Amino acid sequence: MKTMAKMIGLVLGVALLVLAVPLWVYFPGHNFRTVEQGVFYGSRQMGPDALEAAIKKHKIKTVVNLRGTNPGKPWYDEEVAVCSRLGVAHEDFAWSKNRIPDPESLARFLDLMENGRKPFLAHCEGGTHRTGVAAASFLLLRGVGVEAARGQFGPFFNDAPI
């Protein structure tokens, strides 16, 4: 009977771990990445205090919002206000997490990566889909191979269409 209880405990422990890892990845504050030190960072949507701290810590000069222009939404208005107060450029791109960005928007993004004020902080809502596409596009622009670029999508998104 003790062996069966230990076995059940072990199975439940492993199941809990398997379920907890994805939640940890998506939990606020746990999705900030350095794509290229001093040049490009990616994250999930941050509140104003966390955004200000990240801007100051990494000396961010341009925040790239991949969620599109959303005046009137608190997260957007707070983000724009923080950037304005700190003298940081704020660029909006309306990218979908379900499809590849349209060619014009992708070209504008790549132009920003080449000619904009660095370092950049790109973000979407969760910091995975759209931010992964942005990070991978940046790395491909820098001449990094496709496999390394795919690494920006994490273990659950390796089938991303790049």
PLM regions: where:
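Substrate/cofactor-recognition hotspot
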Residues: 127
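Cys-dependent protein tyrosine phosphatase-like superfamily
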Residues: 2-120, 136-162
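Short cysteine clusters
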Residues: 124
